[in-house]
A protein has these predicted regions:
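Walker A/P-loop nucleotide-binding motif
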Residues: 39-61
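Conserved nucleotide-binding/hydrolysis micro-motifs of P-loop NTPases
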Residues: 52, 79-83, 154, 183-188, ...
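Conserved NTP-binding/hydrolysis module of P-loop NTPases
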Residues: 67-72, 83-116
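Conserved small helical "lid"/interfacial subdomain of P-loop NTPases
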Residues: 207-234
Length: 236
């Protein structure tokens, strides 16, 4: 029985695409910026564009490329619980480097009715120092940390908090980078906040309409790479 090949033109939903029409230059630009020295403002990048412009897919592609260059990624969506999500992702994605984390500790016990409670040994430690500890351990092993945050929401207090933390990490010379992605109006409102003036210096990439010629070239290369032919190129 013949095996059906996966259609390379099937739309994706935030995961890896077969090709990036007109977006390769963006990926190259950001990857080049990661090679800059810690503290370079271009290590912070904001992707702006309407829904469906490919912000999430592009950000994920950059994170994968960065991973192959010795970075570890912590990704999350700007919502309640952002800091916890970033911490969990950072620990999970760097577990093969840092090894096993300390187990929860017994912190209290009751006799009547019998009971006990456990908490993480770092639960009472401020977020700044919890992140710093892991970042420092990774940096000491030559591993940079790339934070990627999608769906920028100026109403998300934890996003404001994290940007402030990231500014501290940068000022301390830590090997970190940050990618943000969001709708233009959401990003604009965020940048107007007095609490995130630091990120106004970030490199902004506006994802607009892809040129027709880039779309045509991508169609042709995708068809060729999948061992297919097109009879009338004028139809593209």
């Amino acid at each position: 029985m013949a095996t059906l090949r996966k259609n390379p033109f099937t739309p994706t939903f935030g995961h890896a695409s077969f090709a990036f029409a007109g977006r390769d230059e963006f990926i190259d630009d950001v990857i080049e910026e990661l090679a800059n020295q810690p503290g370079d403002p271009n290590r912070s990048t904001i992707f702006l564009g309407p829904r469906g412009a490919g912000k999430t897919v592009l950000m994920n592609a950059i994170a994968r490329e960065a991973s192959s260059m010795g970075w570890t990624n912590a990704n999350a969506v700007a919502r309640h619980g952002l800091l916890e999500d970033l911490m969990f992702a950072l620990k999970t994605n760097s577990a093969h480097i840092l090894g096993e984390q300390s187990p929860p500790q017994l912190t209290s016990i009751k006799v009547g009715p019998v009971g006990a409670s456990r908490e993480s040994p770092q639960e009472s430690v401020p977020w700044r120092f919890r992140f710093q500890q892991i970042i420092e351990e990774l940096n000491c092993q030559g591993v940079g940390v790339l934070f990627t945050i999608d769906e920028v929401n100026p109403e998300c207090k934890e996003l404001i908090d994290f940007i402030s933390l990231f500014q501290l990490f940068v000022s301390e010379g830590r090997d970190v980078a940050m990618l943000l992605a969001g709708l233009p109006n959401m990003v604009s409102t965020l940048l107007e906040s007095n609490y995130v003036s630091f990120v106004r210096r970030a490199f902004q990439l506006h994802l607009s309409t892809i040129p027709d010629e880039d779309i045509k070239d991508t169609f042709l290369s995708t068809i060729t790479e999948n061992e297919r032919t097109i009879i009338a190129q004028s139809g593209l």
